[in-house]
A protein has these predicted regions:
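Basic helix-turn-helix/winged-helix DNA-binding cores
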Residues: 1-92
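Amphipathic alpha-helical dimerization/coiled-coil segments
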Residues: 81-124
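Heptad-repeat amphipathic alpha-helical coiled-coil interaction surface used
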Residues: 112, 119, 123-126, 133, ...
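Long amphipathic alpha-helical coiled-coil segments
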Residues: 171-179
Length: 179
């Protein structure tokens, strides 16, 4: 899966501005796909040159022109080829998990702080994902497969929260024992 595949999928439903596409990467896709802001616009430019998308400049009064991107027939073929291609293994990288794995080499208090940070950031992400889910359900904007995807994200975050909180409790007991 590449940023190009995700952008083509986004444009399968409707034409969007670069800003709207970037916003979807930062909200909807941020839970399972990581694309930096600096890759989106160069990818759009490359895709336009390859004939996968077209760009239309929309004139706006008092504001800069807006570029709206649409998928071409060639882009649709490319996207469908991606959708039917074999699944790739999931890639998971986590600085927090790496530090936790090697946590025996630093103070327990620091590891507890890391876990507490994990709780806080996961709670924030979970709240945003739940709002996204409720908004999508109430506005009938989500397909069944999108609903399943978001439900998986919610369940994963809830499970992560339980483990993080239990970890804080375990390390707090360890800290008291070493006391």
């Amino acid at each position: 899966m590449t940023s190009q595949d995700v952008i083509l999928g986004i444009l399968m439903k409707r034409s969007l501005s670069g800003y709207d596409i970037k916003n979807m990467f930062e909200t909807v896709f941020s839970y399972f796909y990581n694309a930096s802001f600096g890759t989106i616009y160069p990818t759009l430019s490359k895709m336009e040159k390859e004939g996968l998308i077209t760009k239309e400049s929309v004139i706006q009064e008092g504001r800069p022109n807006k570029n709206v991107y649409s998928i071409t027939e060639e882009g649709q073929k490319h996207f469908k080829a991606y959708m039917y291609s074999p699944l790739q293994a999931n890639e998971f990288k986590s600085d927090a998990m790496t530090r936790l794995f090697f946590g025996e080499f630093i103070e327990v208090e620091v590891m507890i702080e890391y876990l507490e940070y994990g709780v806080s950031s996961t709670e924030d992400d979970l709240e945003r994902l739940r709002k996204m889910y409720e908004n999508g359900k109430s506005n009938s904007l989500m397909s069944q497969t999108q609903e399943i995807c978001i439900q998986i994200g919610i369940e994963n975050m809830e499970s992560t929260l339980r483990i993080l909180m239990a970890g804080i409790e375990r390390l707090s007991h360890l800290k008291m024992e070493k006391g």
